A protein has these predicted regions:
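ABC ATPase nucleotide-binding domain "signature" loop
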Residues: 1-3
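C-terminal lobe/lid and adjacent interdomain/linker elements of RecA-like ASCE P-loop ATPase modules
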Residues: 6-74
Length: 74
C-alpha cells in the first residue's frame, strides 16, 4: 500500500536535507518527494515497430512544475 501524503512530505524533506551533504538519487511516484528535488529526470518508455525503448531526460524548471502537477492529479 504505500505511505500517506504527510509521511511522503516528511520523507521528501529528510531527503532534501540529506542532499545538502551528499548525492541522493530517488525513484518515486510521490509528488511530495519529487517536488523537493533540485534536478528532476523523467523516465519514460517509447514503443517502436521493433521494441520498447526506455529513455531518461532532465526536466527544465517549468517542465518539473508541470510534471509535479500531473503527478498530483493521478
Amino acid at each position: 500500500t504505500g505511505v500517506s501524503g504527510a509521511i511522503a512530505s516528511q520523507m521528501g524533506e529528510i531527503m532534501r536535507q540529506m542532499a545538502q551533504s551528499r548525492q541522493i538519487i530517488t525513484i518515486t511516484h510521490l509528488p511530495q518527494v519529487a517536488a523537493r528535488c533540485e534536478q528532476h529526470y523523467l523516465v519514460y518508455k517509447e514503443d517502436t515497430d521493433v521494441r520498447t525503448e526506455t529513455h531518461i531526460r532532465q526536466l527544465s524548471d517549468q517542465e518539473h512544475d508541470m510534471e509535479i502537477e500531473k503527478m498530483r492529479s493521478l
